Amino acid sequence: MKIILIGTVEFSKEMLRTLIENNFKIQAVITSSNSEINSDYSDLKPLCDKNDIPCHISDDINSNRTIELIKNYEADVIYCFGWSRLLKKDLISLPPLGVIGYHPAELPKNRGRHPIIWALVLGLKETASTFFIMNEEADTGDIVSQVKVKIDGNDNAKSLYKKLSSAAQEQVIEITNN
């Protein structure tokens, strides 16, 4: 399976590393330039360079230039992890298997930004690690994989993030194998 990964945060790097370590074929990575407003920004280029994966910078994922670039790779699936802008239909419709996104919440509940913080603020006892087929709206597509994650009384944002990330790493391997 030919994969393109779109992402720009630490979670994107973790998922990319997981896919590489499990010998999946990454055609290319699309990332953005560093942003002062994104505290979780992570440079994916060094990991791509180390593994001979083309890495492209796009600050407008929906531009004709970026869509043509992605189209030329003829990917079977696009993984979009840690990208804070909505994707347009022209991009979403490219890969035959769709664009798969990730949200660290029990969709359809807790859509939108900062779901880990909200899970803690709301006093939830559990949340979920959720992969879904992306559409033009935020966090609304069909669920591909959802694993519940228990929230303990002593969890904070960092510890809950680690639990969700660990679950997601197992899920992305399973999804990609199937």
Language model feature labels by segment:
Residues 1-39:
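N-terminal Rossmann-like dinucleotide-binding module
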Residues 13, 38-41, 63-67, 85, ...:
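Structural motif corresponding to alpha-helix initiation and N-cap regions
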Residues 13, 17-21, 67-71, 89, ...:
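Amphipathic, non-transmembrane alpha-helical secondary structure
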Residues 22, 77-178:
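Donor/substrate-binding cores of folate-linked one-carbon enzymes
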Residues 35-52:
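N-terminal beta-loop-helix "entrance" segment that forms/cooperates
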